[in-house]
Amino acid sequence: SIDLFNSIPNITNLNNVLRYSKDDGNSWVNIELDTGSYELSAISNEIQRLMANNGDYDQNADNPYFITITANLSELKSIVHISNENYKIDFSVPNSIGSVLGFTNEIIGKGYNESPNIINIIQVNSILVNLDIISGSYVNGSASPTIYSFYPNVSPGYKIVERPSPSLVFYPVSRNEINSMRVWLTDQNNDSIDLRGEQITVRICIREVKNVKRDIVRAIKTLKQDEVL
């Protein structure tokens, strides 16, 4: 079993930049979201907060924010609505958040802007639990130390409580003696998962494989040594 909080970030310094212009592209401003686990609505809220910090909002309007991001749930795309005709967004900059929102190198302006691609807000599709004392496990046809895998099915910030279902799967132990073992988590690409300092609890079950023939031979040898036979 494994217990941990879903603190896996989908926004890092590799995809956290939003570049926008408030004067029809004559000058540009970059804002950066902090590393974290964001849902689409949280991305929109954080962008609006950062823009408001820059003074780029209309406090007298019913909706004071010039940029709002929502989802097209039927097509799994994002919608970026820009309400001010002088505002533009440039997704072509390095480390742009556009890669998360389904945009590539577009520059978009006022109105309804739907991403050409499906959003990529879930960076980790599968969590692999790896253990350095097993053998006989394979992932995508290659030998692997993976003892278990699962999908993080809770929202960011919530606790993941994962139990093997329907039953435990046992793998051969690759050592004769176990003095220590190493457990680590990777994603579907075998990249290490950043838990951002969160504690993780893993429970490993090890059982002895009975070998009746071997046990009988050992018993006979013991009895002979004790001169019972």
Residue ranges and their predicted role:
Residues S1-L229:
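The ATP-binding site of the protein kinase catalytic domain
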